[in-house]
C-alpha cells in the first residue's frame, strides 16, 4: 500500500480533507488568501475621498447660503467695533473662506468616519481598541479647543486690545484681518488640544513612560509658555497665559490617562 500526502493550494477556503479508498490515502490541504488586491484598496480609497469631498462641498454651499449668520456669530466675541472692507471684493472673499472652513469643520466627523471604515478591515482587535478611541478623542479634543478659543481666548485677546486703545483711537477693524486673527487662534488652540493624544501614543509605543513625563514637569512649564507665545497670534500676556494654562492642564491630563491605561 502507498501512503503519501498530496498538497493542493486554492484561494477560496481553508480546510483539510482526507480522501481514503482501499489502496490510497490522500491528504488534501486547501489554503485561503482573503486579502484584496492593491488596486481594489486604491479604488476604495478614491471612493471614500470622493464622498468626503462632496460632503464638504455641500456643507460649504450651505454655509455660504447662511454666511450672514456665521458672520454675526464671529462678531459676537467683540463689542463696540465697526468693521469695514479695504477693497470692493474683500468681504466676498472673506465670506467664501468662512464658508469653506465651516464646511471643512463640520465635514471632519464624516472624514474621520471614512478613515475608520477604510482602516477597520485591516486592523486587529487590539489595534482597533487603540486606534478608534484615539481618532474619536482627537476629534472631540479639537472641538473642545475651538469652544475654549471662542469663549475664552478670543474675548480675552480682543478686550485687551480694545482696553489698551480706549479713549485714544476709535476701533475700526478690517473684517478680513479680524477673520484671519480668529482663524489662526481657532486652529492653533485645536492643535494644542491634541497634546494628550500625542502623549498616549508615545506611551503606548513605549517611547516614553508616564513617570518620565511627570518627572519633566519643570521643563513642561517652560515649554508650555513658549508654545503659548508661538501659537497665540496676539502679543497680549493674558491670552498667552490662558493658552499656557490650558496646555499644562492637557499635559497632566494626558499623563493621568496614560497611567490608567498602563495600569
Curated annotation (Swiss-Prot):
Keyword Membrane: yes
UniProt KW keywords: Chloroplast, Membrane, Plastid, Transmembrane, Transmembrane helix
Protein name as catalogued: Uncharacterized tatC-like protein ycf43
HAMAP family: TatC
Classification via Pfam families: TatC
Protein encoded by which gene: ycf43
GO cellular component terms listed in the entry, alphabetical order: chloroplast membrane; TAT protein transport complex
Major subcellular site: plastid
